[in-house]
Amino acid sequence: AECIFLSQGRVINLQNLIKESEEIELHKPNTKRCIYVASRAIVNIDGVYNKVEDIIEESKGVNKVGSTKQGIGPAYAGEALRTALTMGQLFSLSNDQIDQKVSELCTVFPYLKKEEILQGLSSAKANIQALLQSGKIQIVSDDFLTTDVVKGKHILIEGAQSVGLGKFGGSYPNNTSSDCSLHGILSACLLPKADLCIGVANAVVSKVGGGRSNTKLED
């Protein structure tokens, strides 16, 4: 792959983004590969949305949905409530504006600690700023895949769980929090169509975490 694009439909864990950029450099030193991140991608840091998801999951007792506790669901909830911080906002808003966004987040999820979030954001932002300056990471417009940068190139999109665990086609509530069907993927990437769609299926259905499985044998 010449480049990696994280679309607006993604939740970006800042610590993981830094780590993965370092791993690319480790395995491919002096590479010209770059991680492009959509400005509308949602920001997550360790101890924020994953903490929220952990609290919610544990409160369910024996009725846990099988969450991976990465904070994806609460991050999308934050986006719907317009309290989430995007990658573009992280580098365009003033410190006072970011402070206000975090205050709004802590109003929705009162068990979060504002100062810890601000400290985590500041630390991760400084590290990512260095990667931006080196060209290892670029924050781009959400319609990046339709720009001249990728014109004439092949685009491979990872669909992950697809319909079986999707927000609309999955076995609610034991499903993921995004629409990972073909239509949802194209929408998140702002692409009008797919030229070729390849479906891959296992002989035995598997899933991450616990929860109901429609093909599970009990005997």
Model-derived regions: residue spans:
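Non-transmembrane, aqueous-exposed alpha-helical and coiled segments at domain scale
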Residues: 1-219
